[in-house]
């Protein structure tokens, strides 16, 4: 059966998720996560897309990406293929690494964007030793939101989301962290219950 066409807008903002096949960890160690972020930075410079948030976990990763005129299928294919080549060579394996190509969903509103950002940054709570200190997790963009200087690869544009809050930067950081805590305490019926991506496959 043919795949449903991916819904795309070259000026849209997307929730993108990548996941490894079931028996494989996508990131076995922090060196793998570092390599993936290097590749993300490489292709960001080439395609000029913007990243508003990310969280790299064990078997999967989430991103908020503004395509900024680029075709998400093209740059995600480049990123995933490059990482799979690195991974297979490093671990002496062959075959597919990713489950499907990637999942994507257009962000329809500012309120959805804020909830999505909170959802993605709260993913770190499921990592051992980070349930009560998600802001300490190194492979999430939350650290950049709370300390803009903490953005060594220049990957993340925090201004788009933070500008939805207060003009005062310190107050904005406080308000954003309060949003995360509110999301964590009131998850029922929120975005985390509705991330199905069921119609978002490439052909």
Give names to the regions the model predicted.
Residues 1-53, 66-203:
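Short Pro-Cys-Gly-centered "Cys-loop" motif that presents a nucleophilic cysteine in a tight turn
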Residues 56-60:
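Short Gly/Ser/Thr- and Asp/Glu-enriched loop/turn motifs at secondary-structure junctions
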């Amino acid at each position: 059966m043919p795949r449903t066409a991916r819904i795309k807008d070259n000026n849209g903002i997307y929730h993108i998720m990548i996941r490894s096949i079931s028996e494989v960890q996508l990131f076995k160690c922090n060196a793998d996560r570092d390599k993936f972020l290097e590749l993300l930075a490489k292709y960001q410079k080439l395609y000029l897309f913007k990243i508003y948030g990310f969280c790299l976990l064990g078997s999967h990763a989430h991103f908020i990406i503004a395509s900024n005129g680029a075709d998400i299928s093209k740059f995600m294919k480049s990123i995933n293929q490059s990482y799979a080549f690195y991974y297979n060579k490093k671990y002496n394996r062959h075959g597919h690494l990713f489950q499907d190509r990637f999942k994507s969903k257009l962000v329809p509103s500012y309120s959805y964007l804020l909830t999505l950002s909170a959802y993605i940054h709260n993913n770190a709570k499921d990592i051992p030793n980070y349930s009560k200190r998600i802001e300490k997790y190194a492979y999430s963009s939350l650290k950049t939101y709370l300390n803009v200087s903490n953005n060594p690869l220049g990957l993340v544009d925090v201004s788009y989301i933070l500008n939805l809050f207060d003009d005062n930067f310190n107050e904005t950081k406080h308000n954003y962290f309060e949003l995360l805590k509110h999301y964590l305490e009131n998850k029922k019926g929120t975005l985390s219950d509705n991330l199905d991506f069921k119609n978002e496959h490439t052909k």
